[in-house]
Regions:
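Canonical WD40 repeat/beta-propeller blade segments in eukaryotic WD-repeat proteins
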Residues: 1-4, 39-46, 80-87, 122-129, ...
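Short coil/turn segments that connect the beta-strands within blades of beta-propeller domains
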Residues: 7-9, 48-49, 90-92, 134-135, ...
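Conserved strand-to-loop turn within each blade of WD40 beta-propeller repeats
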Residues: 14-17, 53-57, 90, 96-100, ...
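WD40-repeat beta-propellers
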Residues: 20-24, 44, 60-64, 85, ...
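Short C-terminal beta-strands that terminate individual repeats in beta-propeller domains
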Residues: 30-36, 54, 71-77, 97, ...
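Solenoidal tandem-repeat scaffolds enriched in leucines and small polar residues
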Residues: 32-116
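A beta-strand-loop signature enriched in Asp, Gly, Thr, and Trp
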Residues: 112-177, 181
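Terminal intrinsically disordered, low-complexity extensions flanking WD-repeat/beta-propeller proteins
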Residues: 144, 155-158, 165-167, 175-176, ...
């Protein structure tokens, strides 16, 4: 797992062996290596000076990166690998998703979850907090689930569901409008590996984007919120403009090379 600190100065890296590293990227310097996990670290989330990590060892670690004795707390609430973690600094809540199909909400550094959501029927890797409405959380389920679910984490109540018909790999809210972007893998139809844009709360579909030939595991939004980049197992990065009409992908890409193309979303 990889995750930038909020100011973009430090990069946290989770390794296959369970180590967590913090890098100063500008100086190309490894600042510290932290022990604790006993298996791969695939989920990482920052909350100011708190670095939270989730692992295949089923544990969630809270660490204070300012001090030598960094370990604050270990949480043992998932029965399988912790595959999704996202902090919401505005309401001091942490969402954790697991391969046990569970979505848990934690308040601050508490020992026990504030809410437990059991509705997903596959791993919950895709998690995204809305920047537009406090306590609004979206989560996406894997191949046996294929749903995006919305939650009010202030009340602990489920809100609405989108059945996407595809494995949900990643989610991100549009920074400038009340829309959510989802990336996908295996589909029950012939629409595999697509990217979809949904309007909230109407849940109407704004656009469907195709081009990747393997599941779209990675999704990042530009600081301005005007474009996104997606990465897939097909070894391509694709850049999408959020503000202009979608058009068909014309590129013929070499699957073995890392290439990028710029495409219009709508």
């Amino acid at each position: 797992g990889l995750n930038w600190s909020e100011q973009g100065q430090y990069l946290a890296v989770g390794t296959q062996s369970g180590l967590v590293q913090i890098w100063d990227v500008e100086r190309e310097k490894l600042l510290r290596t932290m022990l604790g996990h006993t298996a791969r670290v695939g989920a990482i989330a920052w909350n100011h000076h708190i670095l939270t990590t989730g692992s295949r060892d089923r544990n969630i670690y809270h660490r204070d990166v300012r001090v030598p004795e960094h370990h604050i707390k270990t949480l043992q609430a998932h029965r399988q690998e912790v595959c999704g973690l996202k902090w919401n600094a505005a309401c001091d809540q942490l969402a954790s998703g697991g391969n046990d199909n569970k979505l848990l909400i934690w308040h601050g550094l508490s020992d026990t979850p504030l809410h437990r959501f059991n509705e997903h029927t596959a791993a919950v890797k895709a998690i995204a907090w809305s920047p537009h409405q406090q306590g609004l959380l979206a989560s996406g389920g894997g191949t046996a689930d294929m749903k995006i679910r919305f939650w009010n984490t202030q009340t602990g109540k489920p809100l609405s569901v989108i059945d996407t018909g595809s494995q949900v790999c990643n989610l991100a809210w549009n920074k400038t409008s009340n829309e959510i972007i989802s990336t996908h893998g295996y589909s029950s139809s012939n629409m595999h590996n697509q990217i979809q844009l949904w309007r909230y709360p109407s849940l109407s579909q704004v656009a469907t984007l195709t081009g990747h030939t393997m599941r779209v595991l990675y999704l990042a939004m530009s600081p301005s919120g005007k474009s996104i980049v997606t990465g897939a197992g097909d070894e391509t990065l694709r850049f999408w403009d959020l503000n202009t009409p979608a058009r068909e992908q014309q590129d013929r890409m070499d699957d073995r090379s890392l290439q990028s193309s710029f495409m219009k979303l709508r």
